[in-house]
């Protein structure tokens, strides 16, 4: 199913790059922002923006419930995590997908595998990489 509106669950340059790419392919974007990021470039570039809480990331950008709520509020049907802790959290992936929202990032299974370095090395060896 094609993405009709993308929520970018990150800030700064990575969010801006994703938004510029989305603009080129006509996908509207939603920015989320913490209190201290209200005037940031990624907020100004997005078609829509949603406040998600206080400055500490654990109280805003890493709060999956707030990201899901922002998707529902704006009609965003997909989330791009950018990079960082959210992009590496298999629990976040599962919660977002369980909410019926498309996750544009590594699958939860891959993240689980990569979290276990020994299993990851073995899997890479079996793939002859």
Region annotations inferred by a language model:
Residues 1-126:
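N-terminal beta-alpha lobe that positions the nucleotide/phosphoryl donor
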